[in-house]
Amino acid sequence: MTSARRGRASVRLLASRIARFARERTVLLVSALAALATVAFVPPDEAYLGYFDVKTLACLFGILAVVGALRGIGLFEHAARLIVARFATCRSAVAALVGSTLVLSMFATNDLALIMMLPLSAATLLKAGWERSLPFAFIMQNLAANLGGMILPFGNPQNLYLYERFSIPLGDFLSVMTLPFAVSVALIALCCALFAKPEPPQPAKKRAAEKEMTKKRATKKRATEKRAAEKQSAEERTTDNSLADEGRQQAAFPASGEPLQRTNVSCETFGPFAVSSGSPRQTARNGEGPTSAFEQGRGADTAAPRIVSARRARALGYAALLVLVIASVFRVVPYPVAVGAVVVALGVLDRRALRTVDWELLLTFACFFVFAGNLARIPAVEGFFSFWMGESALLVAAGASQIISNVPAAVLLSHFADGYQALLVGVNIGGAGTLVASLASLITFNEYRLVRRGFPSRPALARVTPGAYLARFTAYNAAFLVVLLLVCAPFV
């Protein structure tokens, strides 16, 4: 009986581990199954070796490794905190967070930009009492990450792939992507200006109201005591001196009526950030504690990573490696030299950065290559996509991105495109739309669920359920997609 129970427990444990593995690596498993399904139609042969774009995979590995090293020493987070520290209203803070995400996505890819910036946004907005704007900030950051990286070849994986596949000159790439990028930035800025509230930190407003109420109560109390003292003085002259002394003591009480005891600041924890119930700027002004590091860029907040002098040389070295990899993307340096330098340097300086590389993304890309290569060799599929890509490559690319995501759409449709312009624009603006249009959007959705579950006491977050967040997300993304399609269609 005991052995039977142990057997059942082992089976349940194994099933639980398999289910967790599937949940954590859903995208990789789906792409692997899709690739295996196409093998039934196109058996493996020598042509499979031609599916893989080795340079794309190598350059993507180099960028991920160097960005992981820079993130490990806190460079991106430190820079973002310095930017956010200069803004004191909800609107300006949201704009700074979204703008930082957009700029970061140009150099660190969209998914890494979101991984680094979303926790910082949650900590900043929750600390200042702006949790009502958190869903909006997450949606705008998601759009900024997906659309901001389109301007550079290494801003997102599909750009890197198409840049290499079609051997696009850098000048031509920039000229094609300038219009959709400019429209995207303008739309994001407009939304931040219209829908982000220009309110000061909520805890500061509450403390100001409480302080004013305390003053009024103290003034009323002193007036009542004064009248009582005058009445007693008229009736009992024998106690006049004691009453006068008491009156002088009352008059000596501070006019502001502020309570003498300090108010404890409650704290909540989210990820690596401590989230207090007070505004960091207001807390410093009131003498309740030191200004936090993301408020001044320096100070006593030990949670804020700082680039100390001992790490500056390493940061410069990593920056040089990043420049080397980017030079290989632009075909200035042979990519084996750049990637080899990254492996050797990080193997000596920071092996953890090599372990933090998103190997799942690289394997997913390899599966996409097999899936797309096999589909291109199926006559019916080839005829279908060849016809529709000739009719409207922009709409096909954007539409396919809504269903299978923009990275596999770029890999698949590149086999049927006569030119790169419409395909390049379509898969980039196609990152807006459904939740699966860009795999980075899943990062944002999961992060929002995590934040909401971690702060159940915040009513503004409790009201916006994951379903309500998804509805808002879809509405904003659909509006962006429609506008971008209408603007870009006449020019590609």
Show the residue positions of the predicted features.
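Juxtamembrane and boundary regions of transmembrane helices in multi-pass small-molecule transporters
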Residues: P135, G171-K211, L243, G297-I307, ...
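Long, intrinsically disordered low-complexity tandem-repeat segments
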Residues: R207-T239
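Hydrophobic transmembrane alpha-helices that form the pore/transport pathway of multi-pass ion
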Residues: L97, V103-M150, Y161, V411-L424, ...
